[in-house]
Amino acid sequence: VSEDVTTPDYRNSDQYRAFDITVADHVAEVTLIGPGKGNAMGPDFWSELVPIFEGFDADPDVRAVVIAGSGKHFSYGLDLPAMSGDFGPVLAPDAKAGPRTTFHTMIKRMQAGINAVADCRKPVVAAISGWCIGGGVDLITAADIRVASADAKFSVREVRVAIVADMGSLARLPRIIGDGHTRELALTGKDIDAARAERIGLVNDVHDDQEAALAAARATAADIAANPPLVVQGVMDVLDHSRRSAVDDSLRYVAAWNSAFLPSNDLGEAMAAVFEKRKPEFKGE
């Protein structure tokens, strides 16, 4: 970890465009603030996530982390308009090894952001309200504990935009909600409400509103922070030991798969439909 990440300077929110950070009483709180609509995950999100969570991991004053979204929604997921430039070269008809290798590097870089959350030795509690779509689900599956407000809605939406989810949902969800529920959500791209999310174990508890969900997340983080920090880290390490290799293998596989097979006419159609605000017409090409 680089020196500038391990110093308290990482806490200065003025250097970030996608996050706001506070630390008090051994609990860090990180809030998604955009700049895309609905806290969509654009270039700033992906470049800032790693140093922030490496900072939490290395900061002895931080014992637990709360993550939440600003405004009404947790996150709309990947900011396709903002990221479209990264997809362009690999979608070109003559795209060969060069653009595909660059695309593979981009996937690995984005995976590293979500992994920084999952690998943080300080337990992460996610408070979800409103929409949590695509990359938002990737992010909350990397958290250790999830709570939601009654208005929360979840969707593994990638299949509906011709993308195989590659940031961690397919690797982590089966251990959280089971294989059957994971397949249903990932293959249909359907939306589920907070009540079902609680029934299948995606969230631990559902609270009346956003304020109550955030208060519950803060209370849980405070309970964790009151325990011996090295023992908490030991519990985390033991719990994570068995899942690490399986998740890592899955992430490597999907990064390679998407680099080889994701570019398609259907993906181009999905991107065009997003910009033109219409329903895509997929042809399996």
Segments predicted by a language model, with ranges:
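CoA-thioester-processing core
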Residues: 113-119, 127, 133-187, 200, ...
